[in-house]
Amino acid sequence: AMINYTFEPNEHTQFNLATSFRFGKNGYSALTWYDGADPRPDYYRYMPSYKLLNATDLEAASMAAASLADQWMRNVGNIRHFDWDEMYQTNMNFRNAEDEAIYGPGARSNYIIEERHTDQLDWNLAAQISRIYKDNSRLTAGANVRINRTWYYDEVKDLLGGDYYVDVDKFAQRDFGDPIMAQNDMDYYNQYGHARAVREGDKFSYNYKAHLRSSGVWATYATRFGGFGMKLGAELGGLSMWREGLWRKGLFPDNSKGRDRKSTRLNSS
């Protein structure tokens, strides 16, 4: 939404004021997985060239690579596409006593559709005043303010046949093998002793806000002397930014939650 206002107290002076406010949800979906085979058909381990990597029997590997390349060319068994049926079956049938002891009865999804959000609130205000003098010189001055908050988080969009998904950092778990470092929400883990089970519509993986504040003032003066013109201008502004973490992450337990130190910059010209 935008509002503009113009006021002319006399024929030599004009005042303009404009403000705008923008908000909404913005996200895009993607496939993600945990504790399951990579479902991407073009994953490098599924490519014909991978058959030749570190092969001890080059002749046999070459034949296997050629056969796989032929399947790709002819799209045998829809090899070039995601196998959604396989993912649904895996999710619906993934049950074990350890999970049920923690989360209760239900099938744990290995594959889900996530929606990565960048939801914004953005407010802008700009004011300008212009004055024309008797010698036709003009003085124009203005000020502007902007306040922006962008909320970054991941959301479960579709469990693909399962009942819940376990919210852990699969890359931290793979690289460090430490259940503490793999937690996306340490406060929850410390309270309950296990990672959260998330369902459709729940936030998971990451959750933080980025804040921005900016303001500035400026002025210009223009005049003419015979056939010559002169214009002078000056501007002064400031910008501050900071991150606000909403969860304490296992990889960075001491500085991931709460407000970071502000980064501030002054500009002048």
Predicted regions and their residues:
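Outer-membrane beta-barrel domain signature, strongest for Gram-negative TonB-dependent receptors
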Residues: 1-148
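Signature of Gram-negative outer-membrane beta-barrel scaffolds
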Residues: 110-112, 116, 138-265, 269
